[in-house]
Amino acid sequence: MNSLLHHSFLKTVFSSLAIAIVTSSLSSVTIAATHPLDNHPKGEIAASSETAHNPWSGTRLIVAISVDQFSSDLFSEYRGRFRSGMKQLQNGVVYPMAYHSHAATETCPGHSVLLTGDHPARTGIIANNWYDFSVKRADKKVYCSEDPSLSADPQNYQPSVHYLKVPTLGDRMKKANPHSRVISVAGKDRAAIMMGGHMTDQIWFWSDNAYKTLADHKGEMPVTVKTVNEQVTRFMQQDEAPVMPSVCADHASALKIGNNRIIGLAPASRKAGDFKTFRVTPDYDRTTTDIAIGLIDELKLGHGNAPDLLTVSLSATDAVGHAYGTEGAEMCSQMAGLDDNIARIIAALDSNGVPYVLVLTADHGGQDVPERAKLRGVETAQRVDPALSPDQLSLRLAERFQLSHNQPLFFANEPQGDWYINRNLPEQTKAQLIQAAKSELSNHPQVAAVFTASELTHIPYPTRSPELWNLAERAKASFDPLRSGDLIVLLKPRVTPIAKPVSYVATHGSAWDYDRRVPIIFYTPHASGFEQPMPVETVDIMPSLAALLQIPLRKGEVDGRCLDLDPTEATTCPVK
């Protein structure tokens, strides 16, 4: 089989697991946490006459898939190489250039957008981490998917939906009909939480060495999850050396970065017990997929008397992108695994026997390591100047203003994004330091723009097409006056905000289009597909799915709009 689907690192242990999960044997197992309608006979819900004429109507199961860091650039590069699941999806409705319109192109803000229909300014999820000076603990840095009241140590946080301000599609489905079930599965807790929302029935994410759930979800672990965790425990006792797919030979080229580290030649090998490297191997996404397809059958999703929602976030593309960049053999091998995993999900949905709609997109884009990009003609590709770090700037300003060096003047996670002034300083001093910091940062050759919170507060909310938004408007879409920093710093294009490549060599998070643009693909069997190259927004996904489910939205209730998925004179959107 000469395709991306075929690559020899798909181990026998997973093949047997996949068979065990998707066959009907699991459907005979009784678990305590099942829905009252789980015993509904499979296939009893027949397609209505309306469904027969309009494949988008009568949906019993919505499946929303996010591929972490799957940029429009990656989609463009590999869409002609896909031979399986990703190729099949391209028979659907394809938006190759959808925009995360906001500036903070990180995992948590991006996932908060996908199924809420709102920009981060409304969801409240302005970054993966920010500073909340109202929390009682000493460390004021908070994680987007934690409840800080439950832990004094942010390194030992309790995953929670606490910070998400708005409802998700799943929350709206549950409000419309409490019998709807919301199941969320992901490699990252923040992805599962932000896509699932406030009312998940089942939520599973990778944590340390197994798939786990939220502390307040007390039901019995499904057989599917238990089986996958047992499989992980067994195969992690052995070394693994994945074999690179033959189609990736043209991407294999050695690149030396950092302290003589070599990347680009082959997918990562893993030693027994190395759970960190596990996240950049095919096993990471494959086990997440195994849980998703297993729960489709075990919970009989779509077979109740109300539509169900399954959200899936595949996190390995992001892990590979951070560790190796986007243009080496590592990412090519990862794309092969993605193609296979999507094929398995589609096969499970087809076997499930109920009408479904699948949407695939991403939480943000990404860019390659600057060292390789520069070799390939991107002359502006570079790493950030260490002098732009908040600590370095604090020291310089402390000298200028004759302030103590015992505490930082500014707090920030990295040079780009939100910067917070030290709240213990006098008000007049804070105002002077904010203006001084803005001036110094703005004059740095790697900085594109610096906005104060006051400036962003007074900027009108943008309404034009997202590719036309200026930097201030992009920052505005990520700005929450109660959570955002006193300064928002945007670096120039192709400046990687990692000064020294160690474990992370590449990243995202900028306001530039390579981080903002992602594909959106809507797919349902037997529907006429089309491609629309004109830009749309990721906030448009939720209103489009809500329309298919006939869940009404008031004008202006969300930032997104319904996308018409029917290429004929008929429409899948509410008639005005």
Swiss-Prot record:
SUPFAM superfamilies: Alkaline phosphatase-like (SSF53649). Zn(2+) 2 binds at residues 318, 322, 508. Disulfide bonds join 108-144, 248-332, 562-573. InterPro entries: Alkaline_phosphatase_core_sf, Alkaline_phosphatase_prok, Phosphodiest/P_Trfase. The active site is at 107 (phosphothreonine intermediate). One of its GO terms (molecular function) is alkaline phosphatase activity. Zn(2+) 1 binds at residues 68, 107, 363-364. Coiled coil: none annotated. Binds 2 Zn(2+) ions. It catalyses: a phosphate monoester + H2O = an alcohol + phosphate. The keyword Metal-binding applies. Residues 1-32 form the signal peptide. Monomer. This is Alkaline phosphatase PhoD.
